[in-house]
């Protein structure tokens, strides 16, 4: 393929981002990558098909990119990702402007499909389902140079009643430890300091290929890689957290004292309807244990409100939990009725208006909690990775803050500080979600 201009639009989660980065690396061998789709002759849209709003965004983006065939330089429109995997037949008819469609296991066919279309005009539509394949290899990072996501497993075995991911991504399959370590070593050589481990469920890592959960061993091995400063864990199911994992987080200085626990709900009756493999008691006990064992740990969660049949009593139980437990970070999603899931067939679907009201109530409650938690940080000093500038301020994150989903720390510009540096910042003021501070030196003690 001659050096044709290619742009890739990546939607959805950071697991999708990794697929996009893998595609970019392959494309870069024979194409010129451009950021602006209006300049591109080939446009690739890597879609999300998880919930209704994500599907709408994906379809709108595809249609917008398709319009560039008339208004700009686009000759080839490629659509990939979860939406194509989930709705392969419907999309083909709905959007005839698509020239190439690839499922989540077909990225190795990307370059060849583009070449064939440019030569003959022959369209390609692939959507292979796989319970064995894992997309891995070299990537071109779309994150800042100091941070990278590393996928340690693909797929999911949980089959929660509201979720379509196992039907899209297949069963849970861990990557080999040596492959992950090789990737981390390469990233560290590129200057990456923060490694963020992701999967549909990171806590189950290794169960399928090693016969036991070995996330703690993986953390220990990654921490030995020269250049890695922070290791962050996302998507940790509370019921799968082992004592070995707790010990490793506690004792390993490179592992951020931060855990993302996607509990989704707290009422046992709702958890049962969701098909979750845990209970209210288990969730509360693991939170208590983590706080007791790991000093200064930050806990984040995500909740779903408006699940089918959610009563006022069950919602009040959720509010009481949020108020009593006071998690450091919290996000709320309205239940989305997804085709092909058993929850979509449940009776007592909740009105959208009620969902919105419940979402707002939880967020108002959490805003107050977050404000109080942040006040306690005034006077404390943190290591901060510097991310950028806004007007006359620098901003960055400490170990308590994951990129994009959590707050930031702002501080005055310092001529000795560069983007990507890890420096010490002393907190002087607090807001609901963000902190304000000064670069720590002898004068700011």
Swiss-Prot record:
Catalytic activity entry: L-aspartate(89)-[ribosomal protein uS12]-hydrogen + (sulfur carrier)-SH + AH2 + 2 S-adenosyl-L-methionine = 3-methylsulfanyl-L-aspartate(89)-[ribosomal protein uS12]-hydrogen + (sulfur carrier)-H + 5'-deoxyadenosine + L-methionine + A + S-adenosyl-L-homocysteine + 2 H(+)
Gene3D superfamilies with a match to the protein in the record: Methylthiotransferase, N-terminal domain, Nucleic acid-binding proteins, tm_1862 like domain
GO molecular function: 4 iron, 4 sulfur cluster binding; aspartic acid methylthiotransferase activity; metal ion binding; protein methylthiotransferase activity
Cofactor note: Binds 2 [4Fe-4S] clusters. One cluster is coordinated with 3 cysteines and an exchangeable S-adenosyl-L-methionine.
Binding, [4Fe-4S] cluster 1: 13, 48, 82
One GO cellular component, as annotated: cytosol
PROSITE patterns: MTTASE_N, MTTASE_RADICAL, RADICAL_SAM, TRAM
SMART domains, alphabetized: Elp3
Keywords: 4Fe-4S, Cytoplasm, Iron, Iron-sulfur, Metal-binding, S-adenosyl-L-methionine, Transferase
Ranges for domain TRAM: 375-441
Keyword match Thylakoid: no
Catalytic EC class: transferase
Residues in Radical SAM core domain copies: 142-372
GO biological process, one term: tRNA modification
Alphabetical list of InterPro entries matching this protein: Elp3/MiaA/NifB-like_rSAM (IPR006638), Methylthiotransferase (IPR005839), Methylthiotransferase_CS (IPR020612), Methylthiotransferase_N (IPR013848), Methylthiotransferase_N_sf (IPR038135), NA-bd_OB-fold (IPR012340), Ribosomal_uS12_MeSTrfase_RimO (IPR005840), rSAM (IPR007197)
MTTase N-terminal domain location: 4-119
Residues reported to bind [4Fe-4S] cluster 2: 156, 160, 163
Location in or out of the cell: Cytoplasm
Protein function: Catalyzes the methylthiolation of an aspartic acid residue of ribosomal protein uS12.
NCBIfam families named in the record: 30S ribosomal protein S12 methylthiotransferase RimO (TIGR01125), MiaB/RimO family radical SAM methylthiotransferase (TIGR00089)
Protein name per UniProt: Ribosomal protein uS12 methylthiotransferase RimO
UniProt organism field: Clostridium botulinum (strain Hall / ATCC 3502 / NCTC 13319 / Type A)
Organism classification: Bacteria, Bacillati, Bacillota, Clostridia, Eubacteriales
